[in-house]
Amino acid sequence: MSCINESVCKLCRRENVKLFLKGDRCYTDKCSFERRPYPPGQHGQSRLKFSEFALQLREKQKAKRYYGVSEKQFVKYVGEANRAKELTGHALLKFLETRLDNVVYTLGYANSRREARQLVKHNHFLLNGKRANIPSILVNKGDVIQVAESSREMAKIQSAIQAVARRSVPAWLEADHAKFTGTVKDLPNREDVAVAVEENMIVEYYSR
């Protein structure tokens, strides 16, 4: 798990985009980014001109923070994406999207990716009928994710299911909240990825 040492609301403002790190709060008028949509700090509202390198760095940081992965993990995904038989940027996003913690969140069983990581680590989910407590596991087509029977009444999971109506489940996943399950119908395409990131700039950053 990536270590975050500053306010998660400041991260959204720094990257100039909602990263949805605080779950339900991000959809309300209490969202810090909605009230102050500019970078934190004394010169946050100043108009700065960024170099190409700085823009590439910001896109990389944005993606890392959106999915909550460490630099070491991110570099690993970039390396694997370079070896994939498709566009490197698309492969990178596919790896990030199919992480178990991201899938748990996207299916609507956690209020944020950070919360999803905690729930997975604490053995609240099954993958194809077996306990899965590694957030970075990559799911495949046909995999079934299930909330452990003993965890179905947890307040966090119940509140997440109630709040999921605010965001739709993408076509590559199928959620059955009545049965506390989710199925990977297919692997995601680029158009299935909601994060507003320029993946080509990330590839260029690591190609230096």
UniProtKB/Swiss-Prot annotation:
GO BP annotations, alphabetical order: ribosomal small subunit biogenesis; translation
Top-level taxon of origin: Bacteria
Record keywords, A-Z: Ribonucleoprotein, Ribosomal protein, RNA-binding, rRNA-binding
Molecular function GO terms recorded: rRNA binding; structural constituent of ribosome
Cross-referenced Pfam families: Ribosomal_S4, S4
Coiled-coil parts of chain: none
CDD domains: S4 (cd00165)
Domain S4 RNA-binding: 98-164
GO cellular component: small ribosomal subunit
Keyword rRNA-binding: yes
Subunit description: Part of the 30S ribosomal subunit. Contacts protein S5. The interaction surface between S4 and S5 is involved in control of translational fidelity.
Similarity remark: Belongs to the universal ribosomal protein uS4 family.
Protein name: Small ribosomal subunit protein uS4A
